[in-house]
């Protein structure tokens, strides 16, 4: 009987999902993307020593680095065809077999040039204090078109005349916005049409009814791994709105973004760092100074190599926020937690955990809804002793320093979710397993 696992980021993204998805793929026959676009970034480190390889993935599911694992891009993903083909070419040059294992939903909305121009022009027009921190890759405008029912989808590419008609209508609208409101350059219709249609024969062999394919895989007893991108606190409905992404990043989207029923999802694994990070604008109650050497925030930033995979911007760093994690746990219905980057905290004498907030003089034990209230929250901390010993690469619970175990058990109690996995390094075997999501 199959068992299907959903992997979700529980913070503001960048929690280390890629390594965990890759590690879990040992027990899966399929890996599925269900939301976001190429604004997501996963870094996978495979092998050791001279044979070690590093793969940076944006659109292609992490399971592609595993031989024989099928990969699926569901209808909830917005697709930049140029980037997908670029990524496929790069992986094939690295010696991976991709095209006969990768399947794409015909319902994926297409990211086109006008989406990218709109994204960049809007961000440039915002006042400094109100910038979202968008990646400028056209994700948000594409989701807007989807909701407004004017998006062009992968399916449309295979009907050139209809595609041309739809493109003219939507491009007239967006060019008006670009030129009249944003003082940006218009997109040339013929150039956009030719460029988009040129991708049709390259994409067509990949296109499959993902809902049907996943149903049949599940029926055949295959284990499926649903790979979330970004994080719960960036969710368009449940995150620190408006400083969010434009898709739903929560476990429920695994069903909507692929066309499977919720009863096919058996276990939800929440990934969280042992501290907290955030890229771009928006409130961050437990944020620390990352510029002053010898400070905890500097150690998190420096030792944790906290640079965005996609944006190349320094990530903001702060103490672990249990009040925010409790919110994530409830929204996602988490079965278990995976704590990553524990080793980054090695050597910090005292570790603070944000257990709640004070908001307008009143105690609050959950992250509030909406960025304005979150920005006014003052963190309430509990302090635990740190540890001097290295935890890097440890793969057995009993080998962890006692204070590290105490820290993890306290996170477990505060978050009200069992810690099932602890990651102590970037490689597959640098992992402590207390309970395996696939029951292995």
UniProtKB/Swiss-Prot annotation:
The gene is purA. The active site is at residues 14, 42. Substrate binds at residues 309-315. GTP binds at residues 13-19, 41-43, 315, 341-343, 423-425. One of its GO terms (biological process) is 'de novo' AMP biosynthetic process. Binds 1 Mg(2+) ion per subunit. Plays an important role in the de novo pathway of purine nucleotide biosynthesis. Catalyzes the first committed step in the biosynthesis of AMP from IMP. It is found in: Cytoplasm. It is an enzyme of class 6 (ligase). Its main location: cytoplasm. Its cofactor is Mg(2+). Keywords: Cytoplasm, GTP-binding, Ligase, Magnesium, Metal-binding, Nucleotide-binding, Purine biosynthesis. Belongs to the adenylosuccinate synthetase family. It comes from Methylobacillus flagellatus (strain ATCC 51484 / DSM 6875 / VKM B-1610 / KT). NCBIfam families: PRK01117.1, purA. IMP binds at residues 14-17, 39-42, 135, 149, 230, 245, 313. Pfam families: Adenylsucc_synt. Homodimer. Mg(2+) binds at residues 14, 41. It catalyses: IMP + L-aspartate + GTP = N(6)-(1,2-dicarboxyethyl)-AMP + GDP + phosphate + 2 H(+). This is Adenylosuccinate synthetase. Its EC number is 6.3.4.4. The keyword Cytoplasm applies.
């Amino acid at each position: 009987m199959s068992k299907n696992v959903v992997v979700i980021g529980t913070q503001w993204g960048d929690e280390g999902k890629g390594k965990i998805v890759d590690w879990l793929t040992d027990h899966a026959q399929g890996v599925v993307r269900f939301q976001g676009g190429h604004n997501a970034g996963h870094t996978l480190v495979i092998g050791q020593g001279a044979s070690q390889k590093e793969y940076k993935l944006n659109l292609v599911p992490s399971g592609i680095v595993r031989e024989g694992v099928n990969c699926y891009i569901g209808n909830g993903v917005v697709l930049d065809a140029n980037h997908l083909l670029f990524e496929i070419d790069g992986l094939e040059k690295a010696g991976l077999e991709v095209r006969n294992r990768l399947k794409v939903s015909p319902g994926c909305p297409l990211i086109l040039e006008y989406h990218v121009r709109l994204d960049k022009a809007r961000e440039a027009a915002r006042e400094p204090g109100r910038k979202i921190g968008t990646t400028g890759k056209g994700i948000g405008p594409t989701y807007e078109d989807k909701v407004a029912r004017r998006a062009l989808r992968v399916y449309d590419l295979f009907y050139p005349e209809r595609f041309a008609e739809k493109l003219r209508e939507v491009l007239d609208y967006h060019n008006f916005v670009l030129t009249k409101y944003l003082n940006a350059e218009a997109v040339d219709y013929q150039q956009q049409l030719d460029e988009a249609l040129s991708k049709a024969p390259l994409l067509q062999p990949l296109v499959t009814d993902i809902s049907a394919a996943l149903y049949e895989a599940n029926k055949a007893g295959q284990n499926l791994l649903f790979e979330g991108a970004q994080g719960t606190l960036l969710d368009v409905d449940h995150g620190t709105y408006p400083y969010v992404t434009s898709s739903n990043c929560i476990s429920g989207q695994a069903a909507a973004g692929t066309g499977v029923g919720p009863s096919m999802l058996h276990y939800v694994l929440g990934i969280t760092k042992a501290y907290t990070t955030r890229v771009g604008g928006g409130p961050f109650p437990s944020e620390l100074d990352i510029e002053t050497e010898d400070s905890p925030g500097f150690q998190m930033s420096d030792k944790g190599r906290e640079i965005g995979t996609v944006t190349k911007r320094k990530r903001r760093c702060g103490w672990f926020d249990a009040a925010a994690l409790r919110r994530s746990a409830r929204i996602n219905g988490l079965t278990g937690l995976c704590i990553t980057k524990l080793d980054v905290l090695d050597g910090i004498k005292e570790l603070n955990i944000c257990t709640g907030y004070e908001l307008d003089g009143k105690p609050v034990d959950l992250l509030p809804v909406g960025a304005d209230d979150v920005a006014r929250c003052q963190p309430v901390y509990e302090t635990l002793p740190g540890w001097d010993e290295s935890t890097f690469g440890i793969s057995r619970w009993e080998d962890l320093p006692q204070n590290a175990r105490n820290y993890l058990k306290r996170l477990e109690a505060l978050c009200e979710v069992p810690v099932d996995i602890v990651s102590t390094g970037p490689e597959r075997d640098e992992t402590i397993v207390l309970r395996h999501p696939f029951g292995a």
